Amino acid sequence: MKRKYMSEFGLHTFSSFVSLCYPNDLQTVSKEPRYHIYMINKIPKLTFIKGSLVIKEDSISVGINIKTETDNKSKTIDFSFHPLFNHNLFKYIIDKPSKSLTIQGENGGGAICRVLPFYLENGGYLDCEIVYIGQSYGKKGERDAFTRLKSHSTLQKIQSDHLFESPESDIAITLWEFTPRLLTSFDGIRKEFEKSSQEDIDHMQKVLENPPLKIDKQLINITEAALINYFKPEYNQHFKNNFPDVGHDYKYYYDLDFNSILVELDPSAINAGVYSKEKKYKVFNPIEYTLHPEMMRKSMFDIFGE
């Protein structure tokens, strides 16, 4: 099959910031990143182990229990919240659900450590099962994930189902900020293409005059659709079996005659991995789709194939 153009173009969206929290901790997450996509996850049930606290002058250690459907293990974490403080002078309280460790000073001040961020920030690793993917980008970019999730009916249903079906796990939210990049592929080996040299130049000029370098609704639409089609989360209905599709709300990339889309996640930034019942994601192995059927359009990444 001949390549359509000598110069082919694709969209690459990659995660530039990611956060993971419990639903009732959303208000504590930094709102500085512009989160565009959220995932509702099942994660191992984490709890502080009561009675495990060992307090020394210069440090503290505490145990965390990590429970899944198939395993139950613990991890001891040693930490110091300030090298000059005598840690014996503080009061330490683990709450009833064993999700928070409160550190109180003599004057009543202090801090609260939630088990999930505490575990991840101190070398813990979590596999996160994706059960739903959604976007938090409104028509004019006005809606954020925090507003969207406050009264999210699907989140409420997942939490309700989870109480009865998966008591060995917790529900968490992964928030993703994405950054776009233009991919370009030139084939200088072959001499014959479906389109002429002038058509190739016209196509290149059209794309370079409208590069996908700004976040907009269509960019988030196509990123969300690609993620849903790849992972096929349990609670998603749309895009599971009909992506890509020229009739969906990302027609911009068809109008510019893009060849492909790549979506890249980096959950390792927060010591996590992501998977669904359908697929496990591997870091540095991006999700790749051609926007046209293989029998009609050669992939821009297929340089050496016939």
What is each residue range found by the language model?
Residues 1-306:
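Boundary/linker segments flanking structured domains
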